[in-house]
UniProtKB/Swiss-Prot annotation:
Residues 86-280 are annotated as: Disordered. Signal peptide: none annotated. It comes from Musca domestica (House fly). Residues 195-223, 239-257 have a biased composition (Basic residues). Residues 109-129 have a biased composition (Polar residues). Residues 130-144, 229-238 have a biased composition (Basic and acidic residues). This is Female-specific protein transformer. Keywords: Differentiation, Sexual differentiation. Sex differentiation protein controlling female somatic sexual differentiation. May act by promoting the formation of a splicing enhancer complex. The keyword Methyltransferase does not apply. GO terms for biological process: cell differentiation; female sex determination; female sex differentiation.
Amino acid sequence: MEQTSMGKDSSKTAIAKFVPDDDGVLKHTIKVHQQPTSATEKKGPSMIARSNDLIEEIQIKRRFGEGTKPLFERDDVKVNTVADGESISSKKIKSHKASSPSKGVNGLVKQNSPDVTQKFTKKYGSSENPDFRRHSSYEKDNYHKSNSKSGVHLEGHEGNYRPYFSDPIRERDRLRRLYGSPNERRSRSHSPSSNRRRSSHRSRRGSGSPRSRRYTSRHRRRSNSQDRTSWKHNPEHRTSRRSRTRSPRGNRSRRRSSTSSNEDDEREYRHRHHRSQERSYQNVLPTLPPALTNYPCHYHVAPMLALPGVQHRPFLPMVASVRHLPPQALYGGLAGAMPFIPMPMTAYRPHLGHRYPPPRHKINKKN
């Protein structure tokens, strides 16, 4: 029996041939196709083949003073060693000592001397006691520096340190407020950035304030006619009195400002109303007294303007004391048209439409 295996991608194919002992013809041939499972397809770290030559070439390099030392050394991974003097922590200590040698070096030596430690431990107990930190100058300085409000520690920086953001105008105003004369302490100059913020805030607010809104609406109202009876019910006035925002926080101040603006508007309207009453007769068109017509006063005349197809004919005569003719004014010398008033009809006429016709059967009659 002979076995041959062929590998294609991830599947494996095995062919088994059965050869008889004597030189006969091959009778059976078996072909086995094996499909790998999904578990073998997952490539983990254990399936990555690493040769010895590849392991020797692995070397991880770090930048200057980057990272910390590994917990344990590995034979297959080499890391470049950094001297203790070149580490970042030692640099911080060195810069702190160089910036303040009296406090840094001498203070540390004096603070850690056995005489000082015995003196403090006798008086305030061990260093774990909070009184020890309160009365120790070095610990107190470190405690206040760590709990500062600004959170920016400039101890480790050199002398040529420049902040990331500097505003010379603000710095000048701050120095004037601190050390200047009383007149200079009230500085009204603003930096370009603050001016930009103020202008954007004004443009965003627009005419939302009640004062500016009052002036603009007043100007709009003056441009229109001054003799308006429905001034309060005007939609323009309603929109000017309505609040622009709906925030619940500013309701109190907005109500106060709106009431003051409404009072001013009412006062101005009253003043303007009296003024318009005085000038009300200046713009009235001149008219003449009522003129007499050519027709007798006890005849009611059909209007020619309303019904031009109807001829001019008199209706039933009426007594002048019962129904008076309305006065006619002459506009430019032309007589006005007479209004057509139909005569009242008291008789019931079935061919005409009535609002309440009489009932045709007796429903309210009592037996």
